[in-house]
């Protein structure tokens, strides 16, 4: 029998304000990678992280 990979997966978090705000410090979209446990956190991850393009702390949401 093959061993299962487990419930922990790598997800990408993207800044929500970079997509909508045209007057930001530099062009581009801030992205972070993180891990989450699929069994404990079934819904999409949402964390407050520092965005280097907006130059402030913003909400970063999980993308596919």
From Swiss-Prot:
One GO cellular component term = ribonucleoprotein complex
Q: Which domain of life is it from?
A: Bacteria
Per UniProt, which keywords does this protein have? Ribonucleoprotein, Ribosomal protein
PROSITE patterns to which the protein is assigned, alphabetical: RIBOSOMAL_L33 (PS00582)
Which ranges of the sequence are coiled-coil?
A: none
Which Pfam families does the UniProt record give? Answer: Ribosomal_L33
Per the UniProt entry, the disulfide pairs are none
Q: Which GO terms describe its biological process?
A: translation
Listed GO MF terms: structural constituent of ribosome
Which family does this protein fall into?
Belongs to the bacterial ribosomal protein bL33 family.
How is this protein named in the record?
Answer: Large ribosomal subunit protein bL33
Q: What gene does this protein come from? A: rpmG
